[in-house]
Amino acid sequence: MSKFWLLLLLVAAFQFAHSYPAAEYELDETTNDEVRQFIGDGYFEDEGDDGDEERFKIKPGKVLDKFGKIVGKVLKQLKKVSAVAKVAMKKGAALLKKMGVKISPLKCEEKTCKSCVIFKIPTENSFCLTIRFMKTNIATYLVVAGEINRKSKFEEKLKLGNMPRCVNVEGFIGKVCMKGIEGHAKSSSGQANVNFCLGLVAEKFGVGAKLCGIYANKKVRVKISPQLFPGATSLDGDIVKLDDNGEDATTLDVDEVEID
């Protein structure tokens, strides 16, 4: 069952539960702590200590509200893809499983980073990317230069948050789609920084990559290693990755991180 239908069933179940008054439950101390840790204290009404057990009411309205936000986020991430794209992603999954594609660590100096994707079939070829972070008063960009086997092929300026831009690259790799994704990172002192990723997919191989960095103190740092994934483009042109269930396609996001 896909995540979409599973979520619909869960929504229906919570709406059914929401139609009843707040229910009272008696939990032993261990279960009580586990439930509170998972959902949060704000979703309960304590009614005193009965000695060995604590009684409280679950607030279904708050639980449903929290669940609705989670469902909305997941549904927003789900994307429709063509049958051809789904086949390509499954092909990419098989290729990655056989270690036919690898990616090197992202190495950065000041505002510029570089990494290479190595394709080992049918013969070994390298697709290297140089990513330069550029921030202006208007917007934030990633200037991406691509080269195949040490030969320069393209340079694109990607605004963070925009839809992907695709280029037909000469050589073995073919069409490549790229997008800049923006998140946020806070330092331990609370200072706001830019947390970003470059997402790309080589449609011919059904393989994508996500390379992330943090811009802070006028230079880029790396906290998360580059990732490869089975990927394609959705019907609306976004970059998507194959979900763990092997059926759904989801958008790329930026992992929230905290820096020193």
From Swiss-Prot:
- Keyword Transport annotated: yes
Q: Does the keyword Membrane apply?
A: yes
GO BP annotations of the record are: cytolysis in another organism; defense response to bacterium; hemolysis in another organism; monoatomic ion transport; pore formation in membrane of another organism
Instruction: State the signal peptide span.
Output: 1-19
Q: Where in the cell is it found?
A: Secreted; Target cell membrane
Q: What does this protein do?
A: Pore-forming protein that induces lysis of T.cruzi trypomastigotes, bacteria E.coli and human red blood cells. The parasite lysis is much more important than the hemolysis, probably due to difference in membrane composition. Its action on protozoan parasites and bacteria may indicate a role in the control of microorganism growth in the salivary glands.
What protein does this entry describe?
Trialysin
Source organism (scientific name): Triatoma infestans
